[in-house]
């Protein structure tokens, strides 16, 4: 049986791959435009996860991240500057930052035991003390959460999903959506 740390790291790697795969084949506009009412966009998810990896699996264990992130250094992270790509931030640049953050995080996980103590600098003082195990689970959760966002955003852009929805074909999906809509309509305006 695999070691728990290995299992968690494998799940983190799967979630990271899902986030990155959501960008496959998209032009710059679709990679960065807001898809939801709150501005969620694919490159913004990547950019956000760079910073989260830096803090949770780097700084929290006294390990200096490989890059200085301008949106962290200038404090604009607190105005959501980590959730969208500026015109000066290319896809290649943000993906390279993410890959370096992965390598740094993976090295932290390899170097420490799951019960190694850490401290998250921006958490309230009474909750700041934590462990690698807790933050690794948190990172799997955070990345999986945003991989789901990325999957939905991609589906809204061009109908593609990493969940394999292409195998059924457009006609099947139209009928399926119509079936789901009919079920919902039974509870729509005027229903009892």
Predicted regions and their residues:
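Short, helix-capping/interhelical loops that line the mouth of catalytic, cofactor-
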Residues: 1-7, 52-108, 115-120, 156-192
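Short, solvent-exposed segments of well-ordered alpha helices
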Residues: 3-6, 10, 36, 40, ...
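Extended alpha-helical regions
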Residues: 5, 9, 14-22, 30, ...
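A contiguous, mid-protein "functional segment" used to position or interact
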Residues: 130-171
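Alpha-helical transition-metal enzyme core signature, strongest for iron centers
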Residues: 12-19, 42-57, 84, 88-91, ...
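Generic helix-packing signal
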Residues: 35, 109, 151-154
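Helix-loop segments that flank and shape redox-cofactor active sites
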Residues: 17-41, 59, 63-71, 80, ...
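Conserved catalytic core of Hanks-type protein kinase domains
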Residues: 25, 48-49, 111, 138-139, ...
